[in-house]
């Protein structure tokens, strides 16, 4: 499991997750969810978002659910932690939640459209589900370079935001917006290492050969100082149980 292997490296490399964890907390402050009812972070990893929420809502305890045991062990000892495969419906004892969050997790799941309906069903009326995930418009530099040199694109194909929420009423969709986030690296070798370090290389394509990597490095668009960029597009969606 990529995520078990990446658990110890995750916190130092997860700048993009940290950035959007802070953004999600800003939204939670504006929404001011009910304090009664459980607050749970789904796919919590080492607890980045859950800790950030607790830092800003000192009276709230956030439960953490993840499918990587190593990731859960990186969390605070005193918090409720559940080891669970999020490809399955949530445990039946979870219900009446006033806040469910999920930062950078849903795109790993086998059937996100189905799973998000299950998560939504666990909310109490007035409760919020907040998710963030990379969209299918991520990594244009990588895709263009592969097209240019006729090499198979081996990155993940992320989600289409309209697809994900197609079963929800427009009144339930409280907020949906895309944000661009740019990472900058010395070269494509460091760029690919970074993708690997957050456990994000789970793709069925063959590993690139040294020759192919050299080609990619040569043709990837360069900045004036010869560095390379990786552009992410991240969607944040807030769904409200009426």
Predicted segments with their positions:
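A short SAM/SAH-binding and catalytic strip from SAM-dependent methyltransferases
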Residues: 98-112
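Conserved Class I S-adenosyl-L-methionine
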Residues: 46-48, 175-242
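Conserved catalytic/acceptor-binding region of the Class I
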Residues: 128-188, 201-210
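A short glycine-rich, Lys/Arg-flanked "PGG" loop and its adjoining helix->strand segment in the class I
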Residues: 113-125
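Conserved alpha-helix/loop element of class I SAM-dependent methyltransferases that forms part
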Residues: 15-35
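N-terminal, positively charged/glycine-rich alpha-helical extensions of SAM-dependent methyltransferases
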Residues: 1-8
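Local beta-strand N-terminus motif with an aromatic residue
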Residues: 36, 96-97
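Class I SAM-dependent methyltransferase SAM/SAH-binding core
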Residues: 40-90
